[in-house]
Amino acid sequence: MKIEKITGREILDSRGNPTVEVDVVLESGIMGRASVPSGASTGEHEALELRDGDKHRYGGKGVQKAVENVNKVIAPHLIGMSALDQIGIDHAMLALDGTKTKAKLGANAILGVSLAVAKAAANYLDIPLYRYIGGTNTYVLPVPMMNIINGGSHSDAPIAFQEFMIRPVGASSFKEGLRMGAEVFHALKKVLKDRGLSTAVGDEGGFAPNLEGTEDALNSILAAIKAAGYEPGKDVMIGMDCASSEFYHDGIYDYTKFEGEKGKKRTADEQIDYLEKLINEYPIDSIEDGMSENDWEGWKKLTQRIGDRCQLVGDDLFVTNVDFLAKGIEKGCANSILIKVNQIGSLTETLNAIEMAHRHGYTTVTSHRSGETEDATIADIAVATNSGQIKTGSLSRSDRMAKYNQLLRIEEELGDRAVYGYKRIVVKG
């Protein structure tokens, strides 16, 4: 099970931007391959994604430096190590980098190797990746949080909030939940078409129509849920990603950045009032990044106000980092953490963040990025950690479907042991 060869290469992601792919080959000839996702809206404390900066090549977004770090720096250091020593390998790469944000080697280089090693090890043992990562107590299939309307940085629509998601909580299995989501997605397409609105899809496969604002988006989703034959608030709940850091400046939540002149400018208290109003009026049970990553006081107030009846997910706030999560736990900010492997940059650190969250009663949501590949590792991570929730886009684009289809396979493999995740989730007040 010793590592014999590590090869990094530059491939393209779902947005046509370069990203890193890594092959790890063991002495036995068994291989693991992983590719790395990339975000559009990024938290300022995320691990560094190393880009070349050469404007004459892919507009500066090339990843040849990161690939070179895989092939010339990381590979010689890891060859000969056991692929089964995931923690040892990840720690060796962190020591080799030596920076807090992985700025020297690049989180994209380190993560590619980290995930490829795990896949090679699982293949060597001839067990599924979710079983290798999570052990025998892995049987919870996640509730999908499907981003069916895009706003903010993910579209050109005049809506400040970045994502409007459906959560098929009333399903009895992942397979049924996926079907419900697909039916609502197609019903929404008709709702939008009937209004003469665009049904082109954004980065994550959701629609990005020229709606009039947040309430218009929510009402359109309600209409689609009903048109698909489901009951909002019972069969299907709604989740939002406000991505508030994107329009927070000098203590003000400035909606005009995305909504133009009709957009409001809200103080932290007014932002909290507005979010509370929305969950009172709509079947919303999950809000991500409702406050800015730098507004810890606002986060604390929001959690005190609505944390007992709504999942409050920290994405930019926590960046999958145990240091920021520990601060949030101590201050009473949020009650859930979004898990993005490339925010922190190694499998070991990702699992550490999930473990800390669960230990302190926080829920976890395993998540994709807006720039994805056909790699479905996050589906296995969601099951491996009994996360109970996954965010991996809408019901279109094969880079998103790859994850959903992998979850269908896992559920089939688990058979009667499979539990659909929402039953396991208790929102912490």
UniProtKB/Swiss-Prot annotation:
Comment on bound cofactor: Binds a second Mg(2+) ion via substrate during catalysis.
Entry function: Catalyzes the reversible conversion of 2-phosphoglycerate (2-PG) into phosphoenolpyruvate (PEP). It is essential for the degradation of carbohydrates via glycolysis.
Stored HAMAP family: Enolase
Keyword Magnesium attached: yes
Alphabetically ordered keywords of this record: Cytoplasm, Glycolysis, Lyase, Magnesium, Metal-binding, Secreted
Gene3D superfamilies listed in its UniProt record: Enolase-like C-terminal domain, Enolase-like, N-terminal domain
Primary localization: cytoplasm
Active site: E204, K340
Cofactor list: Mg(2+)
Species per Swiss-Prot/TrEMBL record: Bacteroides fragilis (strain ATCC 25285 / DSM 2151 / CCUG 4856 / JCM 11019 / LMG 10263 / NCTC 9343 / Onslow / VPI 2553 / EN-2)
Reactions catalysed: (2R)-2-phosphoglycerate = phosphoenolpyruvate + H2O
Top-level division of the source organism's lineage: Bacteria
GO cellular component, as recorded: cell surface; extracellular region; phosphopyruvate hydratase complex
GO molecular function: magnesium ion binding; phosphopyruvate hydratase activity
Top EC group: lyase
Pathway info: Carbohydrate degradation; glycolysis; pyruvate from D-glyceraldehyde 3-phosphate: step 4/5
A Pfam family per the record: Enolase_N
The keyword Zinc-finger appears for this protein: no
UniProt similarity note: Belongs to the enolase family.
Name this polypeptide is given: Enolase
Binding residues annotated for Mg(2+), in chain numbering: D241, E288, D315
Subcellular localization, as worded in the UniProt entry: Cytoplasm; Secreted; Cell surface
